[in-house]
Amino acid sequence: MQHIEEIKDYWNMRANGFSMAVEEELKTESGKKWEEIFRNTITKENAEVLDDGTGAGFFPVILSRLGHKVTAIDYSDEMTAQAAKRFKEAGAEVLVRQMDAQKLEFADESFDAVVSRNVLWNLDDPAAAYREMHRVLRPGGKLIISDGNMY
């Protein structure tokens, strides 16, 4: 558990700069590509989507533009604050909660889709996070993960 607190402290320290990078990325080809991926993958209208490890809120802005009901979680309180600010500025209605991806506080089968980007490499127990993602995913739901250690 100590390791996850160190990770939280690291991302709390980097939240402001990371948030600025996300703001710029939303304007790039990357944002357009992700919108295309989500449009072609999450085909249910008004799907309930969990962004597991939202960071500064890149995915939820795109998903809300597509009409989905989005819940965004992150363990870093500074990241969730940056994400909430971004959603307000974008006019995106997103529920934001601080939460550990390895111990999701949602009922089984709560979401039509779960998305996650660059989160799993940060975790003490990525397998637990995978199990949790599957647990909260409804039957026939979509799981979209993009991950890699970029540092």
PLM regions with names:
Residues L50-K103:
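Class I SAM-dependent methyltransferase SAM/SAH-binding core
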Residues A127-P139:
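A short glycine-rich, Lys/Arg-flanked "PGG" loop and its adjoining helix->strand segment in the class I
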Residues V70, L143-I144:
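A short hydrophobic/small-residue beta-strand
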Residues A113-D125:
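A short SAM/SAH-binding and catalytic strip from SAM-dependent methyltransferases
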Residues Q102-A113:
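A short acidic, Gly/Pro-enriched loop at the edge of an enzyme's catalytic core
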Residues E78, L123-A128:
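Short N-terminal helix/helix-N-cap motif within the alpha/beta-hydrolase-1
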Residues M1-E45, F58-I62, Q82:
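Conserved class I S-adenosyl-L-methionine
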